Regions:
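N-terminal "domain-start" segment that seeds a small globular fold
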Residues: 27-65, 90, 94
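Thiol-/selenol-based redox modules, centered on thioredoxin-like
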Residues: 161-197
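Boundary at the C-terminal end of the N-terminal hydrophobic targeting segment
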Residues: 22-26
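Short active-site neighborhood of thiol/selenol oxidoreductases, capturing the structured segment around
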Residues: 63-95
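Bacterial N-terminal signal peptides
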Residues: 9-21
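Bacterial N-terminal signal peptides that target proteins for export
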Residues: 1-11
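Structural micro-motif
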Residues: 134-137, 154-167
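Structural microenvironment flanking redox-active thiols in thiol-disulfide oxidoreductases
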Residues: 84-135, 146-148
């Protein structure tokens, strides 16, 4: 009898915990939906400053300084979630192949590689594999997810880093195109971004 009472109490407590968890999940919008609201077309992009490790610009790169010279494309990669991301490599390769088309439109492309501070430089070097990025591309590091968190793009799940994202900013820093991928795929192609310019 005592075992039956304990089992009933356990079942009731489990149901209560499950109900609370389900109601909290129902009330909390998905992180991607939050990011889509914060990064909606017409919004002004938050300024940031990140270290360049390759490409046209060097040193600390500040978005507002780059944006003062024209339109900017911001591409957020996944970084190193335990291995180098083949979809990120393909996307960067696509932008490299189309670099002259972005230059012809007086548009800078900032590729952001997020990750924990430890080993981020090493992982970025592995990702680039000695590739020299042509102008107008610049490869930036986001140590400790400072940028990623500020933009609401942190993919906080095991072996994940950031939601792959592409933003196109006009000369005033307003978002005129945004694509946030909820999976590893569904990235913006260079052609899609060039069309948005």
């Amino acid at each position: 009898m005592r075992i039956l009472q304990q089992m009933n109490a356990f079942c009731v407590m489990t149901l209560i915990a499950f109900s609370i968890s389900a109601s909290v999940q129902a009330e909390s919008p998905a992180p991607v939906q939050d990011a889509q609201k914060a990064l909606a077309i017409g919004q002004t992009a938050k300024d940031f400053q990140l270290q360049s490790v390759g490409g046209e610009l060097s040193g600390k790169v500040k978005l507002s300084d780059v944006n003062a010279d024209g339109k900017v494309v911001v591409v957020v990669l996944r970084g190193f979630p335990g291995s180098q991301c083949p979809a990120c490599s393909a996307q960067v390769g696509d932008f490299v192949k189309n670099a002259s088309k972005f230059a012809a439109k007086n548009t800078k492309v900032l590729l952001i590689y997020p990750g924990p501070k430890s080993q981020l430089d090493q992982r970025a070097d592995e990702f680039l594999q000695g590739t020299k990025l042509p102008a107008p591309l610049t490869f930036l590091l986001d140590p400790g997810y400072t940028f990623t968190n500020a933009y609401g793009l942190r993919w906080d799940a095991p072996r994940e880093t950031a939601y792959p994202t592409t933003l196109v900013l006009d000369e005033a820093g307003k978002i005129q195109f945004v694509k946030i991928s909820e999976t590893h795929r569904g990235r913006s192609s260079a052609a899609e971004v060039l069309e948005a310019l």
